[in-house]
């Protein structure tokens, strides 16, 4: 019989979550974090300042997201890590380098550790586009929080199913 595995958004109390936020472009990343925390709180995650369920780490920029994400994932304390950043195109190739290295680094953390890592790094041509994605039109931070809940839950289901067989 074919098995179907899905995560859910309702079992958030069982998850311990880390959020790694890039300080560069903090006008945008702060809004992403607010949206993310709002989503998590509305789904039952304790987001208070004395939470035992959630930790937030700030890094200088998107380029530094992978190493801190990897450190947190390897700690064994978290079932899912969310990365938040905003890289906005400028007049030099710096944008391409930062985006490529941050995305490759973040993806490798998930593969190497088995901990789901949510890629919440906006890559836009303008500040206006970034702000539209962080709250003016919608807040993708909310979506990243929802993805974290689903992936954390799905991984628990998969681990339970594979250990039972």
From Swiss-Prot:
Cellular component aspect of the GO annotation: cytosol; riboflavin synthase complex
Keywords for the protein's UniProt record, in alphabetical order: Riboflavin biosynthesis, Transferase
CDD domains assigned to the protein according to its UniProt record, in alphabetical order: Lumazine_synthase-I
EC numbers on record: 2.5.1.78
GO biological process, one term: riboflavin biosynthetic process
InterPro entries: LS, LS/RS, LS/RS_sf
Catalysed reactions listed for this entry: (2S)-2-hydroxy-3-oxobutyl phosphate + 5-amino-6-(D-ribitylamino)uracil = 6,7-dimethyl-8-(1-D-ribityl)lumazine + phosphate + 2 H2O + H(+)
Binding residue positions for 5-amino-6-(D-ribitylamino)uracil: 24, 62-64, 86-88, 119
Ligand binding ((2S)-2-hydroxy-3-oxobutyl phosphate): 91-92, 133
Domain of life: Bacteria
Pathway annotation: Cofactor biosynthesis; riboflavin biosynthesis; riboflavin from 2-hydroxy-3-oxobutyl phosphate and 5-amino-6-(D-ribitylamino)uracil: step 1/2
Gene3D superfamilies: Lumazine/riboflavin synthase
Disulphide bonds in the chain: none
Entry keyword annotation includes Transferase: yes
SUPFAM superfamilies: Lumazine synthase
Protein purpose: Catalyzes the formation of 6,7-dimethyl-8-ribityllumazine by condensation of 5-amino-6-(D-ribitylamino)uracil with 3,4-dihydroxy-2-butanone 4-phosphate. This is the penultimate step in the biosynthesis of riboflavin.
PANTHER family named among the record's database cross-references: 6,7-DIMETHYL-8-RIBITYLLUMAZINE SYNTHASE, 6,7-DIMETHYL-8-RIBITYLLUMAZINE SYNTHASE DMRL SYNTHASE LUMAZINE SYNTHASE
UniProt record similarity statement: Belongs to the DMRL synthase family.
Annotated NCBIfam families: lumazine-synth
Protein name: 6,7-dimethyl-8-ribityllumazine synthase
Organism expressing this protein natively: Prochlorococcus marinus (strain MIT 9313)
């Amino acid at each position: 019989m074919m098995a179907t595995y899905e995560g859910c958004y309702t079992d958030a109390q069982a998850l311990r979550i880390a959020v790694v936020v890039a300080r560069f472009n903090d006008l945008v990343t702060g809004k992403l974090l607010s949206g993310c925390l709002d989503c998590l709180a509305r789904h039952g995650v304790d987001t208070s300042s004395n939470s035992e369920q959630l930790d937030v780490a700030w890094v200088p920029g998107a380029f530094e997201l992978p190493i801190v994400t990897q450190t947190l994932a390897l700690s064994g304390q978290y079932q899912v890590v969310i990365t938040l950043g905003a890289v906005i195109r400028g007049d030099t190739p710096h944008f391409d380098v930062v985006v490529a290295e941050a995305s490759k680094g973040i993806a490798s953390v998930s593969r190497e550790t088995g901990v789901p890592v949510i890629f919440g790094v906006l890559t836009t041509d303008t500040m206006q586009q970034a702000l539209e994605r962080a709250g003016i039109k919608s807040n993708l931070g909310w979506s990243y929080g929802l993805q974290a809940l689903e992936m954390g839950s799905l991984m628990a289901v998969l681990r339970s199913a594979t250990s039972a067989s």
